[in-house]
Amino acid sequence: MARYRHSRSRSRSGYRRQRRRRSRYRSRRRRYRRRQRRSRRGRRRGYSRRRYSRRRYSRRRRRRY
């Protein structure tokens, strides 16, 4: 990553677009996780954690982002 940033021959607009997309993904992911942790204590208290399989949840999350 550091070598790519310092390279002079790269197209400036393409690099900026790539950086913006990456930062937006990271911030959205952090916000989504915080919101879910709060909701789990309230609405999903009766929902058994074992039945709500982590594999299915992670697959849906990967497709969305």
Swiss-Prot record:
<dbReference type="GO" id="GO:0003677">
    <property type="term" value="F:DNA binding"/>
</dbReference>
<keyword id="KW-0744">Spermatogenesis</keyword>
<dbReference type="GO" id="GO:0000786">
    <property type="term" value="C:nucleosome"/>
</dbReference>
<keyword id="KW-0217">Developmental protein</keyword>
<keyword id="KW-0221">Differentiation</keyword>
<dbReference type="GO" id="GO:0030261">
    <property type="term" value="P:chromosome condensation"/>
</dbReference>
<comment type="function">
    <text>Protamines substitute for histones in the chromatin of sperm during the haploid phase of spermatogenesis. They compact sperm DNA into a highly condensed, stable and inactive complex.</text>
</comment>
<keyword id="KW-0539">Nucleus</keyword>
<dbReference type="GO" id="GO:0035092">
    <property type="term" value="P:sperm DNA condensation"/>
</dbReference>
<protein>
    <recommendedName>
        <fullName>Sperm protamine P1</fullName>
    </recommendedName>
</protein>
<dbReference type="InterPro" id="IPR000221">
    <property type="entry name" value="Protamine_P1"/>
</dbReference>
<keyword id="KW-0544">Nucleosome core</keyword>
<dbReference type="GO" id="GO:0005634">
    <property type="term" value="C:nucleus"/>
</dbReference>
<comment type="similarity">
    <text>Belongs to the protamine P1 family.</text>
</comment>
<keyword id="KW-0158">Chromosome</keyword>
<keyword id="KW-0226">DNA condensation</keyword>
<feature type="region of interest" description="Disordered">
    <location>
        <begin position="1"/>
        <end position="65"/>
    </location>
</feature>
<keyword id="KW-0238">DNA-binding</keyword>
